[in-house]
Amino acid sequence: MQEYTLRTEHATVVAIDQHARSVALAAVDLATGETRGTRLADCPTAARIAGWAESWATGPIRFVYESGPCGFQLCRDLRALGHACDMIAVSSIPRSADDRALKDDRRDARGLLEAVTSPTSRCRAVYVPSEEAEGARDAVRAYFDQVRATKALKMQTSGMPLGHGHVWNERTPAGKLRAAWTRDYVDWAGSVRLREGSPQGTLKACLEATVSAIDGCGELRKGLLELCLEPRWKPYVDALTRLKGVDDVVALSFAVTVDDFSRFPNGRSVSRYFGLTPGRRDSGERVGRNGRITKAGDTTVRRAVIEGLASLPSHTGARKRGRKGREVSAAVEAEAAKCNDRNRRRYRGLVDAGKKANVAKTAVASELVRQMWAIGLVVAREQAAGR
């Protein structure tokens, strides 16, 4: 989103502050400087928005709007009508104190218009994925959201018997503590009698909600594993799972989020996209000091990749075994083996140098997403060549 591009390719820019049932529009004619604005209610369509601009604007029109819960559909619809349209990352739009204190739809639209047409604009356009990729990504995010919600339910529910003096201490014949949240555990928790004055029905309701959530996680995961076998994603999942610490769900999460592997110019841009590059805290004479990772971008993939590296301390130099029906090319196999060896040595070197285990894992995760991108590029080229 550069000012030069706007002025050389488009005569009019229209900023949209989008809501579910209404939009506020602010527009400027780049040749004359004339500005206009309006508000459209009753769930306006892309055709209605474009019609307002076309009724007075001259030359090519570029539409822009903030990223938000309304998603990519407006952008797709406006592009289908033949107009240029970008969704702008809301994190890249500058906000003044006045903008935060005095907020309304028309002011937001004017602020976005000023931001994207400024000669020093640093606004970034969001990548618009294919509808297939967006649907798969929504399924992935729903699964991880359900996993986190289920974890919270488990902690809440298992804490109720414990708080009343009941401890799960069933053990195997070998003396090992049996796992919680098995059928035996649920039966045991259901048989617990709380102290007088505590509603027994609360524990029962929490148990039912937790068991239902666990079942929901299983169903969602099953759906993701079926997606992994779809022709669109299977080559990428098969290739990415050759990397240690990357299972089917992590591989699918990465593939559906990236969608088009060629959109990244280099590996560092991939790490930056997933918030795995260190921040900077330079000021005055304090220069060259890196801070914590930025945690910008897609949280789901970043968390999945880091959690997938939990087994990193136990990685050996042995190759990861392939599965029947999940064969990959020799180029992918060789690249994955090289990456696995590098990650193992990188982790061990950082730990031996005194870095904390989680810091070392995060550093490896930053390299791992680059490696996944590089392998994805190989697969994309093979698919294009009709391997």
Where does each model-flagged region fall?
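Short glycine-rich phosphate-binding loop at a beta-alpha junction
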Residues: 60-68
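Short alpha-helix plus adjacent loop in nuclease-associated cores
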Residues: 86-125, 175, 180, 287-296
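Glycine-rich, often acidic, oxyanion-interacting loops/wings at catalytic, nucleic-acid
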Residues: 141-239
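A short, charged helix-loop
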Residues: 113-141, 180-197
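Gly/Thr-rich phosphate-binding beta-strand-loop-beta motif of the actin/hexokinase/Hsp70
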Residues: 7-29, 112
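Nucleic-acid-processing active sites and adjacent nucleic-acid-binding tracks
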Residues: 32-59
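Phosphate-backbone recognition surface of nucleic-acid-processing proteins
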Residues: 239-242, 248-353, 386
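Basic, amphipathic alpha-helical segments enriched in Lys/Arg and hydrophobic/aromatic residues
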Residues: 339-341, 345-387
